[in-house]
C-alpha cells in the first residue's frame, strides 16, 4: 500500500540514492509527505461552471481567462476571426502574469485565491485590453487578499454518473532520467519549476511543492457535472481549456469538434520560475487558421508564427454526460495518441 512507498523499503532506497549523490531529498521527505484533499475553484461562463484545482497548479489561469472573456460577446465575430483570437490571447497574457506573481504552494505563500476569480477583478483586467492592438507588455494585477513533458490524461465515467478527471506527469521527457537502485522507475523533475529567487512566492524551500502545470477539469451545469476533460501540454493547458469551452459554449461545437478546431498557443512573458521572457511573446497558430486572420493579427501587433506540428497544441480528452438520455459522448485528440472506449 501507500506506506510501502513512502515509509518502507522503497522510500529507504530512494533516500539512500539521493544521499549518495549529495542530493536534497531525505527519508523524512518521503515519510512525512501527505496528499491533500482541496476544494476546486470555479467561474461561471455563459451559464456553465468550470472547476479547476487551485495553486500550486495553474488551473486558476483558465478560470481567470474566462473571468476576463465573459466581459465581451465573442459571438459577434466568427470563431476564426482575428478579434476572437486577439481577446483570448490577451486574456491569456494577463492571466499568466498573475501566474508568475502569485501562483505557489499556499502553505508557504499568501495567495489571493478569491480575489483572482472575482468578477470585479475580471472586469479590471479586461479593461486593460486594447481591442485593436496587442499590448507591448502586461504586468500582474492586484487582486484583493482576504484575511490579509510526458503527461498522461485519463477520464472515466460509469453508468451511475460517477466521473473522474485524472492527470499525471513526470514532466520533461521521462522525467529526471534518474532511477534509484532496485526500484525500476524514474523520478519526476517538477523541481525545475521552483524559483531560485528567495523573495519569490515560488522560491525553493524544504517541504514545499513547486508550481506545476497539470490540471484536470470539470464542467458543471446547475450543480451537476456534465463534462470531465483535460488537455495535456505544459502552459498550453489553461489556454486549451479555454479554447475548448469557447468553442462549445460560444459557438455550439460538440466535444469532438471543439477539440478538432484550430488552436493557438501563446508563449512568453513572466514565468513562475522568476524568468522574465519577451513580454509580447510569440503567438503560435495552427495551419487551419485562415490567412486573413493571420495577417490581421500581425497587423494588430502580435508576433505570429505558423506551426504545423500539432504536438505543440496539446492533447485533449473528454467525456460529456447527457443525463436525460442516460448516455455519454467521448472525444479524443487527433494531434497525439489517444482513444475513446466504451464498455
PLM segments and residue spans:
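Alpha-helical support elements that line or immediately flank enzyme active sites
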Residues: 4-7, 12, 16-19, 232-256
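Short Gly/Pro-enriched turn/cap motifs at secondary-structure boundaries
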Residues: 40, 53-56, 143-147, 205-211, ...
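Extended C-terminal subregions enriched in glycine
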Residues: 160, 208, 241, 250-311
Amino acid at each position: 500500500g501507500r506506506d510501502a512507498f513512502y515509509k518502507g523499503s522503497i522510500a529507504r532506497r530512494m533516500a539512500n540514492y539521493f544521499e549518495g549523490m549529495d542530493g536534497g531529498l531525505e527519508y523524512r521527505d518521503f515519510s512525512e509527505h501527505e496528499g491533500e484533499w482541496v476544494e476546486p475553484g470555479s467561474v461561471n461562463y455563459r451559464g456553465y461552471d468550470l472547476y479547476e484545482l487551485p495553486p500550486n497548479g495553474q488551473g486558476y489561469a483558465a478560470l481567470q481567462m474566462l473571468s476576463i472573456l465573459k466581459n465581451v460577446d465573442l459571438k459577434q465575430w466568427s470563431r476564426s476571426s482575428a478579434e476572437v483570437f486577439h481577446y483570448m490571447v490577451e486574456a491569456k497574457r494577463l492571466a499568466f502574469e498573475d501566474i508568475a506573481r502569485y501562483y505557489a504552494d499556499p502553505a508557504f505563500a499568501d495567495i489571493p485565491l478569491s480575489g483572482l476569480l472575482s468578477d470585479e477583478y475580471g472586469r479590471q483586467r479586461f479593461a486593460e485590453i486594447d481591442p485593436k492592438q496587442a499590448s507591448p507588455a502586461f504586468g500582474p494585477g492586484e487582486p484583493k487578499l482576504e484575511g490579509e513533458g510526458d503527461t498522461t490524461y485519463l477520464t472515466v465515467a460509469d453508468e451511475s454518473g460517477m466521473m473522474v478527471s485524472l492527470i499525471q506527469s513526470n514532466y520533461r521527457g521521462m522525467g529526471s532520467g534518474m532511477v534509484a537502485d532496485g526500484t525500476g522507475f524514474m523520478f519526476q523533475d517538477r523541481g525545475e519549476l521552483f524559483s531560485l529567487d528567495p523573495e519569490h512566492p515560488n522560491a525553493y524551500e524544504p517541504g514545499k511543492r513547486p508550481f506545476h502545470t497539470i490540471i484536470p477539469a470539470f464542467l458543471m451545469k446547475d450543480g451537476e457535472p456534465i463534462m470531465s476533460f483535460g488537455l495535456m501540454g505544459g502552459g498550453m493547458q489553461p489556454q486549451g481549456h479555454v479554447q475548448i469551452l469557447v468553442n462549445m459554449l460560444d459557438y455550439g461545437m460538440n466535444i469532438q469538434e471543439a477539440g478538432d478546431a484550430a488552436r493557438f498557443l501563446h508563449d512568453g512573458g513572466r514565468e513562475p520560475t522568476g524568468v522574465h521572457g519577451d513580454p509580447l511573446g510569440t503567438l503560435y497558430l495552427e495551419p487551419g487558421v485562415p490567412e486573413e486572420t493571420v495577417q490581421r493579427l500581425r497587423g494588430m501587433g502580435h508576433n505570429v508564427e505558423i506551426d504545423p506540428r500539432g504536438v505543440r497544441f496539446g492533447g485533449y480528452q473528454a467525456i460529456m454526460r447527457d443525463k436525460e438520455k442516460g448516455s455519454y459522448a467521448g472525444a479524443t485528440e487527433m494531434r497525439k495518441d489517444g482513444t475513446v472506449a466504451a464498455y
